[in-house]
Design a protein with these regions (language model features):
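Alpha-helical multipass membrane-protein architecture
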Residues: 1-617
Length: 617
């Protein structure tokens, strides 16, 4: 650890202000991207680079202050994962507008619990373990390298990459979405032998940037999913629904949205669960091994770099958040006009399920983040398990009550509402230990980082609520438009939220077309087997979750993602050849890859922020 023996300023007013601004910016970007394609990007490295550039203007800035800014801002990328669930409340027809304070409390209390639950795990999982924590180590390395360069050239160069990407994407977004001078997508379709073949091309620089971050394996998997959906499933199924009065675009879109998407839902579900199952054994074994080997002396306990938030502080915050959750659940349940008995019962059980499942997923997600990285951790799998457990619990409690169609809709909404809290807890715990690893490597004070994360939760929650509302009012969600006459093609897909809503409705209403979902599960299992075989060759992989997403998302979204992933491969291959004989080859390649990552992040931020601004106008 670099600064273990020094006592440098860490939690500063300027750092908190900068961290709060970055939290709001990256939260808005991630909410937009997550609703559009079901992906979010890690904000840690862009936050580190921006922080270094801005704080270099102050002579007294230091590496630990920079670390606190990225710790706070990183909450944006993770807390915004609640958008994988919350839109489901609109898709199931229960909400027609956002209750702002309920949404805020879900994010705040769920995220806060995620921070608190992982504090006791810091020493065992961060200090004593040999887990990789890839994003945490990467952020620490950037901080260390930049700190050696007192002129902060690295930070200034990095912020130029982000700014350039943001500017280009914002201009294009202004032309296409603002002035409508450029098309945002093009649709092509034709009918052959009573089978409809469709294709659409999206022109989104944010998606291009996201594809660059996804990489080649993810791009190929998305392409495979897209080919299955539009080259096989849609043409085959459209043959049975051929209508000469429909044009090719309408027929293909109708079959894909009503049937093929359910196949994608099944594939996503089994792939997410498989990822979770695959990690279960190493998670359990790893935690056992870590706990067995933990040893700490009294001297170490008193060192600055070993001090967490006190048990008293944790307990007080825990009680406040549980009480806040209970009040939020009661407010939600009260709208259903149930008897006081059921109001109290569902409020208590909803809070209990959120806290108990949240505790277990916090440990699991923290370990998985260390094992495979926050970006690869199967958060959607956690959400899937959460909505299934919540639905079953409430179905058992109100089996007779929920025979009423209106109350059945309420039950679906309650299960989704509960899952949103669980996912907020999982998302933050997924990121918390990653940040603490960065702090451990540079010599930060743990309790100060934990405070920064809690502050990040507050500002992240404040940003998520209005941004969600703006985007919903401007674009709507698939199957849930705020007003009549809106362009359904511009609706935000929110694929994971649609999946959660579909599963919950299937459990309570018994009206889901399980046949298509079952076939999707079969497709997912087939992709898992193929992925295993390919990994055995050690040359490539085919992420099954990405295949499912490729089936579920429209080509207008998939194609830019695929192009972005292929583009990264081409660029890195060119650079590998260019620096083949360079004595600093690895360092050069790492620097170029980081610049590409920052530029791609800038594309996402530029278009996303502009999309939010246009929505507000």
């Amino acid at each position: 650890m670099m600064y273990k023996k020094q006592n440098l300023p860490e939690l500063t007013l300027r750092g908190l202000i900068l961290g709060s601004i970055l939290t709001i910016i990256f939260t808005a970007s991630n909410v937009y991207l997550g609703l559009k394609v079901g992906l979010t990007f890690s904000s840690s490295i862009p936050a580190v680079v921006i922080s270094m550039a801005v704080l270099s203007l102050f002579k007294t800035s230091n590496i630990l202050e920079n670390n606190m800014v990225q710790t706070q801002a990183s909450a944006a990328g993770t807390l915004s994962s609640v958008i994988f669930v919350i839109p489901g409340l609109f898709m199931c027809g229960y909400w027609s507008e956002f209750p702002l304070w309920q949404t805020f409390m879900i994010c705040l209390c769920g995220g806060g619990l995620g921070v608190l639950f992982t504090i006791p795990l810091r020493r065992t999982m961060v200090v004593e373990s040999k887990l990789a924590y890839p994003e945490g180590r990467a952020a620490a390395e950037i901080l260390k390298v930049a700190n050696k360069d007192q002129s902060s050239k690295k930070g200034k160069q990095g912020i130029k990459e982000i700014a350039l990407g943001s500017f280009i994407a914002a201009i294009f977004s202004l032309l296409s979405n603002g002035f409508k001078l450029a098309a945002s997508e093009s649709n092509f379709a034709f009918i052959w032998n009573k089978m409809a073949f469709g294709f659409s091309m999206g022109y989104s620089l944010a998606l291009l940037g996201a594809g660059y971050l996804v990489g080649l394996a993810g791009a190929i998997a998305l392409f495979v999913g897209m080919f299955l959906a539009w080259g096989i499933f849609t043409p085959y199924l459209s043959n049975f629904e051929f209508d000469s009065t429909k044009n090719a675009v309408d027929l293909a879109s109708s079959v894909w949205s009503s049937k093929v998407r359910l196949i994608g839902t099944g594939a996503i579900a089994i792939a997410a669960l498989w990822t979770l199952i695959e990690l279960l054994k190493p998670v359990i074994e790893g935690i056992k091994e870590i706990v067995k080997n933990v040893k700490i002396t009294n001297q170490e306990k008193n060192e600055r770099t070993n001090i967490d938030l006190s048990l008293k502080s944790i307990f007080i915050l825990f009680v406040l958040m549980v009480v806040g959750l209970f009040i939020t659940f009661y407010s939600f349940v009260e709208d259903a006009n149930l008897s006081i008995y059921y109001q109290m019962l569902f409020s208590f059980v909803g809070t209990l399920v959120s806290v108990l499942i949240g505790f277990f997923v916090a440990a699991a997600c923290g370990y998985m983040a260390g094992l495979v990285g926050s970006s690869s951790s199967p958060i959607s799998g956690i959400g899937l398990i959460g909505v299934i457990i919540s639905s079953i619990v409430f179905l058992v409690l109100g089996v007779e009550l929920f025979q009423d169609p209106m109350l059945s809709k309420f039950a679906v909404a309650l299960a989704i509402f509960t899952t949103s809290v669980i996912l907020a807890t999982a998302a933050i715990s997924n990121d918390n230990l990653q940040d603490l690893k960065t702090g451990h490597l540079v010599g930060a004070t743990p309790w100060k980082q934990q405070v920064a994360l809690l502050v990040g939760c507050v500002f992240g929650a404040l940003a998520i609520v209005p941004v969600l509302n703006l985007l919903y009012q401007a674009y709507g969600f698939v199957g849930a438009m705020p007003r009549e006459g809106m362009d359904a093609s511009s609706a935000l897909a929110a694929p994971q939220a649609n999946l959660m809503s579909t599963i919950a409705q299937g459990i309570f209403h018994h009206n889901i077309e399980w046949g298509y979902m079952a076939f999707g599960v079969f497709v997912g299992i087939l992709m898992i087997i193929i992925d295993k075989i390919l990994k055995g060759t050690q040359k490539m992989s085919l992420p099954p979750l990405a295949v499912g997403i490729g089936i579920y998302l429209p080509p207008a979204v998939n194609i830019p993602l695929v192009i972005g992933g292929i583009l990264k491969y081409i660029v890195m291959q060119h650079l590998t050849k260019k620096y083949a004989k360079n004595s600093h080859k690895e360092e050069k390649l790492a620097s170029c890859e980081q610049r590409g990552t920052l530029f791609a992040s800038g594309l996402i931020v530029g278009e996303s922020i502009f999309g939010v601004i246009i929505a507000g106008i």
